[in-house]
Amino acid sequence: MSDYLSVTALTKYIKYKFDQDPHLQSVLLKGELSNFKKHSSGHLYFNLKDNNSVVNAMMFKAQANKLDFNPKEGDEVLIEARVSVYERQGNYQIYVNKMHLDGIGNLYQKLEALKKELKKQGLFDTKHKKEIPRFPKKIAVLTASTGAAIRDIYSTINSRYPLVEQIQISTLVQGKQAKDDIVNKIKYADTLDADVMIVGRGGGSIEDLWNFNEEEVVRAIFEAKTPVISAVGHETDFTLSDFVADVRAATPTQAAVIATPDQVELSQYIKQTELNLSRHIIQIINNKKKHLEHVASYYKFKQPSLLYDQQIQKKDDFERQLNLSITTKLNNALQKVELLTNRINLKDLKQQTLQGIQSRLQLHDSLNKSIINIIDNSKKRLSQRIENLNSLSPSNTMLRGYTIVNKNEQVITSTQSLEKNDEINLQMKDGTVDAIVKKVRCNHNE
């Protein structure tokens, strides 16, 4: 009995053989749809037949949603599928991945071959994609002069960003002459110094959209220096122009949205930016004001003499050190002269004495001149420093009639800091005055 297989075991073995056969994983079939049914789940169940044979088939919802037509009983179709076994009934059947109406199969093969070649050449590489400007000044629109596409694009641009200049370039999008016209219009638009170019049309069959799969059109988009937005057909339509363009839009309306900012959002952004700038400027002004008040309250500005008292003392110390140094050098020189004088032979005493006296006189004159020059230069530098300090001195300002107002030991710089009956202190050039505010008058222009 162990040599006998169950029906289930046999069916599983046959299914295993089917699933392991690479020739059955992707087969291309053509035939007629019969017994066609669409389940409530979205899956499709049908038979594919020709004059001599029939095979069961099904297509899952995920693949069925990608169809570019609505299949029906009697349609002649081209199918890509895998072959397997439905274990419950023991029947082999096909699981369909792709399905197209027969008659355009050659177009799809041509499309896939060209797509593969252009991809190999790098035309679809991300590194070639140009950025779409955020705030375009000029937009070139290449599409038919009539139809829903141009209306959708213009109405969307006008509602979102009416400031932009729109250049309509009427273009053939269907027919035998459309390919060359699209290429020429792309090259022309590329000379207009536009910020972005929209190339597209409304939806249609694969034959209607085929001009946007032509190699010449694809290369024209690739070679354009102007950023290109492709907007061909509906969301489920894909052409080679979509792959080579800098951005692919699902519809002409979406292309207009991608190409333009929203004026409402821009207005809100500008208002928020203005508010942020105002807050930042006010914060800077307040910080500077606090810093100025802090500096004005610094004790050296309350007692201006502190700014230059130490400099005067340093000058006096320098003069004392200089005089001491000169005196020391002079005494050393005189000692050397006396020492040399004592060594002079008696017979040359008179001559040496005269020469020594003359040298001492010359040395004395030279030292006096040096001392005078050093003292004069020091006085000039000191005078310049005192003059600079006086120009900054509040005391010097008070000599011209100005007064420093203090309240609670804080310098008052504005009438807004005072109120009636406030006790204040007025610091003048020769003393201080205590006073009480009777009335405050504010200059409202500041």
UniProtKB/Swiss-Prot annotation:
Pfam family, one: tRNA_anti_2
Keyword Nuclease annotated: yes
Reaction(s) catalysed by this chain's protein: Exonucleolytic cleavage in either 5'- to 3'- or 3'- to 5'-direction to yield nucleoside 5'-phosphates
Domain of life assignment: Bacteria
Keyword set, alphabetical order: Cytoplasm, Exonuclease, Hydrolase, Nuclease
Gene Ontology CC terms: cytoplasm; exodeoxyribonuclease VII complex
One annotated GO molecular function: nucleic acid binding
Binding partners and assembly: Heterooligomer composed of large and small subunits.
Role: Bidirectionally degrades single-stranded DNA into large acid-insoluble oligonucleotides, which are then degraded further into small acid-soluble oligonucleotides.
HAMAP family: Exonuc_7_L
Protein name, as recorded: Exodeoxyribonuclease 7 large subunit
Originating species: Staphylococcus carnosus (strain TM300)
Gene field: xseA
